[in-house]
Amino acid sequence: MFSKILVPVDGSENSFRALEHAIFLSTKIKEAQITVLYIIEDLPSLYIYSPKIMEKLRADYEREYTRILERCKEMANKSGTNINTVLKEGDPASKIIGYSDMERFDLIIMGSRGMGKFKEMIIGSVSNKVIHHAKSSVMLVR
């Protein structure tokens, strides 16, 4: 069955709904372990950025991921569920697929989209890449 569940989150409501589904599923499958994964997208490393600007960007990312992961922990605590949190840096789709494959997750539960439609058309959605390239089963949540 599904004993290892990976839930990538990006702060979108869809990603929090995915976590709600994972928490619900874990109440039905007593041995299920949930890991919440947040990915910091690569910081642009253009030569025009000063070290001060890069530090500010990094601090902004840190505040954001801390806020998001704290919300995930609160959601889990309300239902009496334990979760693990993991932070990675890089391309979201590649990191989700790579981490899932490396840790042998049985199921990835993720939001169907986290960014605007226009941006998805240009670069392709993370969820679409994960569906087509992950070895694990994938459940998309709207």
Language model segments and positions:
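Short beta->alpha linker loops
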Residues: 52, 87-91, 113
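A short acidic, glycine-rich active-site loop
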Residues: 54-67
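Conserved beta-strand positions in the Rossmann-like core of class I SAM-dependent methyltransferases
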Residues: 35, 84, 139
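Phosphate- and divalent-cation-binding pockets in alpha/beta enzyme and binding domains
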Residues: 17, 95, 117
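Gly/Ser-rich helix-loop-strand patches that form or flank binding pockets
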Residues: 4, 98-142
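Class I S-adenosyl-L-methionine
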Residues: 23, 66, 70-77
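Structural beta-alpha unit
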Residues: 74-108
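Small/aliphatic-rich secondary-structure junction motif
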Residues: 3-52
